[in-house]
Amino acid sequence: MLFRSDYGVPQNRERVIFIGSRDGETATFPIPKYCKDGQTLPKWRTLKDGLNGLVDAEPEYMSYSENRLKYLRLLKAGQNWRYLPEELKKEAMGGAYNSGGGKVGFYRRLSWDKPSPTITTTPHQKATDMCHPVELRCLTVRESARMQTFPDDWIFYGSVSSKYKQIGNAVPVLLAKELGIYLVNLIQGNKTQGKEIFEQLSLFSL
């Protein structure tokens, strides 16, 4: 289980990665380059870091309904539905108000100072809202691509929803690069320091 944030991706999500060895060698993974608190390594990159310098001349995004905007206008960066006035919470949440779970994604404005939540294929969905910290819209296609560490000149084809799907389903570029370089070094017999994983998940035991 690897944290994207540990490898320079400004996004907070775990990813299950399998590395197999037919020679019976201990499986290892790339050493993290960032850490959460910034004490031993550079601190995790934030949404602000990820979007720094982005020029989105023709932004593409899915629009919110006026009903959704009614509540998002009342929220600041880093807040969600729980910060709405008490008398509006139940109205805003509807049937989800009494359901279980943390529901942290409802009416969520992203925080500048933390890694982005998981980039999904539908950033405008009510339960997994990816609303910009200060603007009344979800992250644009290009902003979402930045969170997945795609280069700005990478071209996505199709409709706006198709582009979001391509981005949300992708493995973050920086994470894939770190894994690729690490595996090439292993295959070539280079002595590469790795992060040893000893835990066997019972989920995969036969």
Task: Give the residues covered by each predicted segment.
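Class I S-adenosyl-L-methionine
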Residues: 1-100, 104
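C-terminal target-recognition/interaction regions appended to catalytic cores
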Residues: 66-206
